[in-house]
């Protein structure tokens, strides 16, 4: 699968309502979009439009964290993930990482700026990224044409598509595509649920099954 899939009304209304309410009840920690010491990594490509801002994060799950504690949000989020992935005609294999990111306006963040373009995991570039938007806000997700190559950074990034957050919508794309968030300018906050997943091996863009899609509004955009 090497396309960008976008869907509105991607969850049943009761599930979407639960997310849009409970994201305000989570405990968040202060973090950077990308840490300063990561900017030289081959999976990060800052450019003249980059503004690296502070964000608030609620971490739900990371596959490399073997501590026995389980975040109570993991089960309902995994349930919702399965609905969204199957709505695109795929089957999810594993959840690799789950977190909630919150960005707020910054006085130095200008229209056309974005946070550091990156891939989420340089060691697992074959993963998939699903971003769920629980609320309406500004602060587009930037998806670039360029893909990760462990031997060479792209010299320049070109924008393929911008996704404006719309409540109860999601976007799915392969994890080797460079992407970036952007801070809201008009809204008081931008909240998204960021998911890294793997798909079952026998599901590819050639056998994607949408016949049983229970929701309307599937669009296939940006097919390479």
What is each stretch, according to the model?
Residues 1-91, 214-221:
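Non-heme Fe(II)/2-oxoglutarate
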């Amino acid at each position: 699968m090497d396309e960008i899939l976008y869907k509105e009304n991607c969850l049943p209304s009761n599930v979407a309502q639960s997310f849009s309410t409970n994201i305000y009840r989570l405990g968040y920690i202060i973090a950077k979009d990308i840490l300063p010491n990561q900017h030289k990594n081959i999976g990060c490509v800052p450019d003249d439009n980059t503004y690296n801002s502070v964000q608030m994060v609620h971490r739900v799950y990371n596959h490399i964290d073997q501590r026995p504690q389980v975040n109570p949000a993991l089960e309902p989020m995994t349930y919702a993930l399965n609905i969204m992935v199957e709505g695109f005609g795929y089957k999810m294999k594993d959840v690799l990482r789950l977190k909630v990111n919150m960005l707020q306006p910054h006085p130095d963040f200008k229209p056309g700026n974005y946070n550091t373009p990156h891939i989420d995991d340089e060691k697992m570039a074959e993963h998939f990224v699903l971003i769920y938007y629980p609320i309406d806000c500004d602060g587009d997700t930037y998806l670039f044409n360029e893909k990760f190559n462990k031997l060479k950074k792209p010299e320049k990034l070109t924008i393929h598509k911008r996704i404006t957050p719309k409540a109860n919508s999601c976007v799915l794309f392969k994890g080797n595509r460079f992407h970036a968030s952007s801070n809201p300018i008009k809204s008081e906050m931008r909240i998204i649920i960021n998911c890294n997943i793997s798909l079952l091996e026998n599901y590819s863009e050639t056998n994607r099954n949408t016949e049983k899609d229970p929701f309307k509004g599937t669009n296939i955009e940006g097919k390479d």
